[in-house]
Swiss-Prot record:
Origin superkingdom: Eukaryota
Function: Involved in cuticle function and is essential for normal morphological development.
Gene of this entry: dpy-20
Originating organism: Caenorhabditis briggsae
Region of interest (Disordered), ranges: 93-116
One Gene Ontology term of the molecular function aspect: DNA binding
Name listed for the protein in its UniProt record: Protein dumpy-20
Chain sites annotated for binding Zn(2+) 1: C154, C157, H172, H177
Organism taxonomic ancestry: Eukaryota, Metazoa, Ecdysozoa, Nematoda, Chromadorea
Zinc finger (BED-type): 135-184, 349-398
Binding residues for Zn(2+) 2: C368, C371, H386, H391
InterPro entries: Cuticle_assoc_protein, Znf_BED, Znf_C2H2_sf
Biased composition (Low complexity): 96-116
Length: 439
């Protein structure tokens, strides 16, 4: 009987505390679907023996019960169980594989050697929303942890880096943590080399069969090893084809060049002198040439030809520009100084031939020499479009010069944002239409 009375007293005390605490935390009235308030009835636990015999404040799970019922901190905050401690020095001195730890730095537990003794205190952090579904494989993420989608925080100096990406984080390490930056770059190179090897094995099958030897061409000749000071006669080793324009071969001294082996080498006769200036400049070598001396001479001749073509184009551009300036000066009666150096935005020289028709202005724009029209954002593409719309003849000439120059400097590459020249009607040739009279 005494036990029952004690239980009744405890139940009465708990109901009083419940009636005082719950109304202050949870609202007792809730609106229903019709806009009327409905009163929440108090629960009656007198008939539950398990609740009376086991009180929540006497059990070990009371803090969890309190958090789940009132504060709901467990569902809002994430308390990480493992924290990175960058004050620990790694025994091996190298970073561990970042692919084993995932993308977020909060889940990375690698022992990273750091130049700054910095340990992370266990504090609750909000779990960010990751924008990408794939993991971030850059090892610099081990030095940062996310704050949100745009901000990350450095674990070494606690500075916030905006626009969270691997490039910005690597630049931060390069500027403020040089030793750690060297470790990150080394680990990144190693990771990329391993990743490239794995991908190549996945996409390409490695053949174990040896390579087939290259067959010896029937028209190849064996060149014996020659002393460096002896005179070399091409007629001893090469058969000259009879031709009306062919010139007898003359002996010439061989240059002292080291050979890779003492054995004789086989050289196929696959190269011939091209027709043109080369035959006139080096007639003593004959038509075919397969020696290293001939190859070096060919390269030098090509360089000379490229330089001569480039100089010729520059001279033509300079002459056209001077002629246009002189014509405009005579027409308007003003003197234009051609010796003044134009305003150069870039350190390198403007090489496009369209610059012969434009000059820079003081406000950063460009002015057409032909029509004095101002072109904003001066660049070769805008200049070409201006000539295409207003000066079709000059546009065709500039386009052909540009293609010719590109063939010399960059053979086989044609990169331009303007269309090829077509026939545009000039302003001088006004199209006349027949006039029909209405009777």
């Amino acid at each position: 009987m005494d036990g029952h009375s004690n239980t009744s007293v405890i139940l009465h005390t708990y109901q009083q505390q419940q009636s005082q605490l719950i109304p202050s935390i949870i609202p007792q009235t809730l609106p229903d679907g019709y806009g009327l308030t409905t009163t929440i009835s108090q629960p009656d636990f007198s008939g539950t023996n398990a609740f009376i015999n086991t009180n929540p404040w006497n059990t070990t799970t009371f803090p969890t019960y309190r958090d789940n019922q009132y504060t709901n901190e467990v569902s809002v905050l994430n308390y990480p169980t493992v924290y990175d401690d960058f004050s620990k020095e790694s025994t091996a001195g190298t970073l561990s594989d970042p692919s084993l730890h995932g993308s977020n730095s909060s889940s990375s537990t690698s022992d990273v050697g750091s130049s700054v003794d910095c340990s992370i205190s266990p504090e609750p952090i909000l779990m960010p929303c990751v924008k990408r579904g794939r993991p971030t494989e850059n090892p610099c993420w081990a030095y940062f942890h996310r704050i949100d989608d745009q901000l990350v925080k450095c674990r070494l100096c606690t500075k916030v880096v905006r626009s969270a990406c691997a490039t910005n984080m690597t630049k931060h390490l390069e500027r403020h943590h040089t030793d750690d930056y060297q470790k990150v770059t080394g680990q990144l190179k190693l990771f990329r080399m391993n990743d490239a090897g794995i991908r190549s094995k996945m996409h390409y099958q490695v053949a174990d069969t040896p390579l087939t030897p290259i067959p010896v061409l029937p028209n190849s000749y064996v060149l014996p090893k020659m002393d460096p000071m002896e005179a070399f006669d091409a007629s001893q080793y090469y058969t000259m084809q009879p031709d009306s324009t062919a010139i007898n071969a003359q002996p010439f001294p061989q240059f002292d060049q080291p050979q890779t082996s003492a054995d004789s080498q086989t050289w196929p006769l696959t190269h011939f002198w091209p027709n043109g200036a080369q035959n006139n400049m080096m007639p003593q070598l004959g038509e075919p040439s397969t020696s290293a001396i001939g190859a070096s001479v060919i390269q030098e001749i090509r360089k000379l030809n490229l330089d001569s073509d480039q100089k010729r184009l520059e001279l033509e551009m300079d002459q056209n520009r001077r002629l246009l300036l002189a014509q405009k000066a005579d027409e308007k009666g003003r003197v234009v100084k051609t010796t003044t150096k134009p305003y150069q935005k870039r350190n390198r020289k403007t090489e496009h031939p369209v610059w012969a028709f434009f000059k820079r202005t003081g406000d950063g724009n460009a002015e057409c020499i032909i029509c004095q029209g101002v072109v904003k954002s001066p660049c070769s593409s805008n200049f070409m479009r201006h000539l295409m719309r207003h000066h079709s003849t000059e546009y065709n000439d500039v386009y052909l010069k540009w293609i010719e120059k590109r063939n010399v400097t960059h053979p086989g590459i044609h990169c331009t944002s303007v269309p090829p020249p077509i026939s545009f009607p000039n302003k001088d040739n006004v199209r006349t239409e027949p006039i029909f009279t209405v009777k």
